[in-house]
Amino acid sequence: MLLDMIPNQLFRPAPVTARDKLLEAGVKLVREQGYAATSVDELCREAGVTKGAFFHHFASKEALGVALANYWSSSTGAFFAAAPFHHHPRAIDRVLGYVDLRIALLGGPPESFSCVAGTLVQENFRSSEAIRRACEDSIMGNARAIEADLAQALADAKVTSPTAASLSRHIQTVLQGAFILAKSQEAANSAEMARESLSHLRRYFELLFNVEKKEIEPCPE
């Protein structure tokens, strides 16, 4: 059952400080309406803090954007690091478990599952080098997190090409593309469109690694 693959924890703890409240507001608003359409006033209103508090923590809206990408990276990184798929003894099962977890997380409207770093970089890849770099670190860091399992799966299957690094980037390409496709759809169809893309990715891995048509073995307790 896919829901069994989701870690029993929130992506992020409830914010307590003004800074974290602003970052949480940033996650919500950037997902809903994008970075450019989100003003400092809106961020403060959503966070329930003053404008003075904003500029106490962030020198500019761009500084908030950089911090937001880093905040997203650290919180989602911890979430995926705690996921049950890591307990599979076989590397290919860990890889497929990661893809299955990604599929399980795709539900509701796009703003409930889309990537903050992906949204930020789409809007700012030429206008803000600082935000672009922070988003690169976020997206590529996510790719590197599964690279060792991919390398082991390739070795186990005696597959010499492509490389683990290339496959890890391909996963991110499919994910980010799925998020964009979902945003182009009516809300009722968006998650299903994204799941379809990830299902094709899973089938590609099954073919590449010569996986038999059977369910992944349950994770050991």
Predicted regions located by residue number:
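Hydrophobic/aromatic-rich alpha-helical bundle segments in the mid-to-C-terminal region
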Residues: S112, S128-G141, L154-E221
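Hydrophobic alpha-helical connector segments
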Residues: A67, A81-F113, L167-I171
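Secondary-structure edge/capping motif, primarily at the C-terminal ends of alpha-helices
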Residues: A83, H87, N124, A182-Q185
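N-terminal intrinsically disordered/low-complexity leader segments
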Residues: M1-T17, A157, V211-E221
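Amphipathic alpha-helical segments used for helix-helix packing
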Residues: D93-R94, G108-R133, I180
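Short, basic, alpha-helical segments at the C-terminal edge of helix-turn-helix-like DNA-binding modules
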Residues: N70-G77
